[in-house]
């Protein structure tokens, strides 16, 4: 199984790709899609193009994305929602089923506490994947999303008789 994690953002969208084989997690790739365009439609297209390129290179079999969180600034929430929507649509266009996780779920799965700091997430991602250095924040978050998805799907698979459809309902 190859899992693509996406940490959507209006300026930087992080991505992380892991491979799971024999219940072991292996690092494949990670990075950031840095948005350089000025107009909103071109910014959103840049996100879609970047994710499409990642899908074409790494051929993920599953995808996961962070759920939207509360914003004090309504415009910030709208921009993040647009980026997230484009990311989810691009994944769906490429026939990837998309699972969603809250920031708390992701931190809990990777660090062991839902209130973990960004630096703790970076450190645990580095440790779990055997990386020589901490990945950048957005890439670390995306890798953490992929790791969370693996742990979540592994746990759900243990539930006797849980099909892919019923697993989605359990969430």
UniProtKB/Swiss-Prot annotation:
PROSITE patterns: RUVC. The active site is at residues 7, 66, 138. Its EC number is 3.1.21.10. Gene3D superfamilies: Ribonuclease H-like superfamily/Ribonuclease H. Keywords: Cytoplasm, DNA damage, DNA recombination, DNA repair, DNA-binding, Endonuclease, Hydrolase, Magnesium, Metal-binding, Nuclease. Mg(2+) 2 binds at residue 66. The RuvA-RuvB-RuvC complex processes Holliday junction (HJ) DNA during genetic recombination and DNA repair. Endonuclease that resolves HJ intermediates. Cleaves cruciform DNA by making single-stranded nicks across the HJ at symmetrical positions within the homologous arms, yielding a 5'-phosphate and a 3'-hydroxyl group; requires a central core of homology in the junction. The consensus cleavage sequence is 5'-(A/T)TT(C/G)-3'. Cleavage occurs on the 3'-side of the TT dinucleotide at the point of strand exchange. This is Crossover junction endodeoxyribonuclease RuvC.
């Amino acid at each position: 199984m190859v899992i693509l994690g996406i940490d959507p953002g209006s300026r930087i969208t992080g991505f992380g790709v892991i491979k799971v084989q024999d219940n072991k997690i292996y690092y494949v790739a990670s990075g950031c899609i840095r948005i350089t365009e000025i107009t909103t439609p071109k910014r959103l297209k840049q996100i879609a193009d970047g994710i499409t390129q990642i899908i074409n290179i790494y051929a993920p079999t599953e995808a996961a994305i962070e759920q939207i969180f509360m914003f004090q600034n309504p415009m910030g929430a709208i921009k993040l929602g647009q980026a997230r929507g484009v990311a989810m649509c691009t994944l769906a266009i490429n026939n990837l089923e998309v699972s969603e996780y809250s920031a708390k779920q992701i931190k809990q799965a990777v660090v062991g506490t839902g209130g973990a700091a960004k630096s703790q997430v970076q450190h645990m991602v580095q440790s779990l994947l055997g990386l020589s250095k901490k990945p950048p924040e957005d890439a670390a978050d995306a890798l953490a999303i992929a790791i969370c998805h693996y742990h979540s799907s592994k746990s759900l698979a243990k539930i006797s008789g849980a099909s892919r459809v019923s697993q989605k309902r359990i969430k």
